[in-house]
Amino acid sequence: MGVTWVFEAEQTAKSVERLLESIGGDLHGTFIVDVTPFNPPTPSSDYPSNVVMHHSKCPQSTFSICPKDTFKKSPKAVCDRGFDLILSKLSSGLIADNAGKIEIIGNEYSLYKDWMIRVGTATQGTTVKGVVVEIEYDPSIIVIQCKDMMIEFVKSVFNKYHETLPEIFKITEKPESYTALDTMWQYLGIATKLRKKT
């Protein structure tokens, strides 16, 4: 997994896919991301919610984040796939908010061997909430090495969205390795925003 940039697109998934095909993108497969909040039985500031996420790029992993203001302040973990099964047994402490679950399902495109672009439709239950695009630059996992290249790519392909940088691009000044948790934090932010849409 390389450095990734996730954003909500204003176009339909089909129009983004046509755009990718027009610049040489090859359909590589499909992908799915799910974001499920687990909340305490009674809302309390002492006991925050926990969000459990999965990404088909990491099929054996479950990502768990207790969201705070920033990524650095948020308790987070990467667990074995069975972690969400354990949470379901802790219903006295955390209850799955299945009505708040967001699923993003779509297609993966490879472009020039270095880029993987995932375009998916986000749904909450039976309601379509939006289109999400994930751009992954595979040659490096060092954020500051990829940042400018990714900004130029987004700018040249989409002609927008390049001004809304992911938090990881803004806070990273030293050569730090990018991890899958950084990607899931971006998905969490988008899912939170999409949940509020009517």
Swiss-Prot record:
Pfam family, one: Med20
GO cellular component: mediator complex
GO molecular function terms listed in the Swiss-Prot or TrEMBL record: transcription coactivator activity
Biological process (GO), any one: regulation of transcription by RNA polymerase II
Subcellular location: Nucleus
InterPro entries xrefs: Mediator_Med20
Main subcellular location of this protein, as a coarse class: nucleus
Stretches assigned to coiled coil: none
Keywords: Activator, Developmental protein, Nucleus, Transcription, Transcription regulation
First and last residue of the signal peptide: none
Transcription regulation found in the keyword field: yes
UniProt keyword annotation of Disulfide bond present: no
Protein role: Component of the Mediator complex, a coactivator involved in the regulated transcription of nearly all RNA polymerase II-dependent genes. Mediator functions as a bridge to convey information from gene-specific regulatory proteins to the basal RNA polymerase II transcription machinery. Mediator is recruited to promoters by direct interactions with regulatory proteins and serves as a scaffold for the assembly of a functional preinitiation complex with RNA polymerase II and the general transcription factors.
Subunit: Component of the Mediator complex.
Family: Belongs to the Mediator complex subunit 20 family.
Protein name: Mediator of RNA polymerase II transcription subunit 20
